[in-house]
Design a protein with these regions (language model features):
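Intrinsically disordered, low-complexity Pro/Gly/Ser/Thr-rich segments with frequent PxxP/GP/PP motifs
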Residues: 190-228, 364-385
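C-terminal edge beta-strand
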Residues: 62-74
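Solvent-exposed segments in extracellular or luminal domains encompassing
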Residues: 38-48
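Asparagine-centered strand-capping/turn motif at beta-strand->loop junctions
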Residues: 150-158, 163-183, 239-241, 340-352, ...
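Short, solvent-exposed loop/turn segments at the edges of extracellular beta-sandwich modules
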Residues: 56-61
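Surface-exposed, flexible coil segments in extracellular/virion-facing regions
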Residues: 17-40
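Terminal connector regions
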Residues: 225-263
Length: 385
């Protein structure tokens, strides 16, 4: 049954309330107290449920918590699945009160998986940057996705620069596409979460830039803040190149001109993170759901879509060393799912690595994973559509 909670507060007329914080908790079937952030849409377990509320004033001070208790009977009005998919709210957490083993579901049938001619230039190693230096550099042509994710592990502020450099003897033109930036921040999960949603909701830029031989252009000029020690920054960007364009990722001391990046020493890659250039780094995945039972679509596993794709986790080359490299998580790879279903079907996103935050586009609508915070167990999911 739907829960509707109203509240009144006493406050100065002139003073705004910048933040309102709801939490709710209950005791699960194993006797554990479970607490979730946000306002519950409904209750899906019998017993006592507690909802708390606190508000923040204009000076940043939080009120004492107000508390409201509900006693929920054993009378089931609707299952969680029935309720969530009838009252669709993309981004909300699917609690999985019954602790259904979602990983035990049968894999859905992938009719085919096709790759797209997109080159991925990925800079994620060394993830922890101790000193200024060249993090990655290679030349790209045609459609390219650029990705980096680095943490300042030194003692002084750094800037991470994403640089386009024409090292040919002819003018080179490239077009800016979608882009998403995040950081600096101390929270790596927050950085990935913000970067992904900013990229997905960004519009195609369309700006054309022509570089003369030897000329450079700062691709991430929107990231102006220096990165303080222990903070990190990331970016994901698409470009379309006519000709051959060098792209470099460099860590530089604050105040250094990015155009002097060629004087920097090359920083060695550090496992387990990777860096490299990868061909055919975009997938279109076609799924046919027959509607008979719940099924799973597995992304990010080495054997995902085996029989349809030789190597799902892409391999490439570290252009700075010539060594073969493996993108163990398909970081920066754009994957599009095309799903056909025989019946009306609900979609849940279930992270298998426990604590997770992220975002997807579902039918061109941004869906946050989740809208109210981290997913903390492999039993929970997020309602996508």
């Amino acid at each position: 049954e739907t829960v509707k909670i109203e509240y009144d507060l006493k406050n100065e007329v002139w003073e705004e309330i910048p933040a309102v914080n709801f939490n709710y908790s209950w005791i699960d079937q194993d006797g554990n107290t479970i607490t979730k952030r946000g306002l519950p849409a409904a209750f899906f377990a019998s017993g006592k449920h507690t909802v708390t509320l606190s508000v923040q004033d204009a000076f940043g001070q939080w009120s004492d918590e107000a508390e409201l208790e509900f006693e929920v009977s054993d009378n089931v009005q609707a299952t969680e699945a029935e309720y969530r998919f009838t009252n669709l709210n993309p981004g909300e957490i699917y609690l999985n009160i019954d602790k259904t083993n979602l990983n035990g579901l049968l894999a859905a049938n992938a009719e085919k998986v096709t790759t797209q001619p997109v080159t991925l230039l990925d800079s994620n190693s060394p993830e922890k940057v101790n000193t200024p230096g060249l993090l990655y550099k290679d030349a790209v042509s045609g459609s390219a996705t650029l990705h980096y994710h680095h943490l300042n592990n030194g003692q002084s502020p750094l800037n991470i620069y994403l640089i386009a450099h024409n090292e040919t003897d002819q003018p080179v033109t490239f077009t800016l596409g979608k882009s998403g930036y995040a950081g600096p921040s101390l929270d790596p999960m927050q950085v990935g979460y913000i970067e992904t949603q900013n990229y997905l909701k960004s519009a195609y830029n369309g700006t054309k830039i022509t570089l003369k031989p030897g000329e450079m252009y700062l691709l991430n000029s929107a990231q102006t803040a220096s990165i303080s020690p222990n903070s990190l920054q990331s970016a994901l960007m698409d470009i379309e190149v006519e000709g051959k364009l060098t792209v470099a990722v460099a860590a530089m001391s604050s105040g250094m001109d990015y155009k002097t990046y060629t004087t920097l020493p090359v920083l060695p890659s550090v496992e387990p993170q990777t860096r490299g250039t990868y061909a055919n780094a975009a997938y279109d995945i076609y799924i046919n759901l027959d509607g008979s039972d719940a099924q799973k679509i597995m992304l990010g596993y080495p054997d995902s879509f085996s029989g349809k794709l030789d190597d799902y986790l892409i391999s490439g080359t570290d252009a700075l060393t010539g060594a073969e490299t493996y993108n163990k998580g398909n970081y920066g790879v754009i994957q599009r799912l095309h799903i056909k279903a025989a019946e009306r079907t609900g979609i849940l996103v279930n992270p298998r690595g426990a604590i997770f935050r992220g975002a997807i586009l579902w039918n061109d609508q941004l869906c946050l994973l989740s809208a109210t915070g981290q997913i903390k167990t492999t039993q929970e999911s997020v309602v996508a559509g």
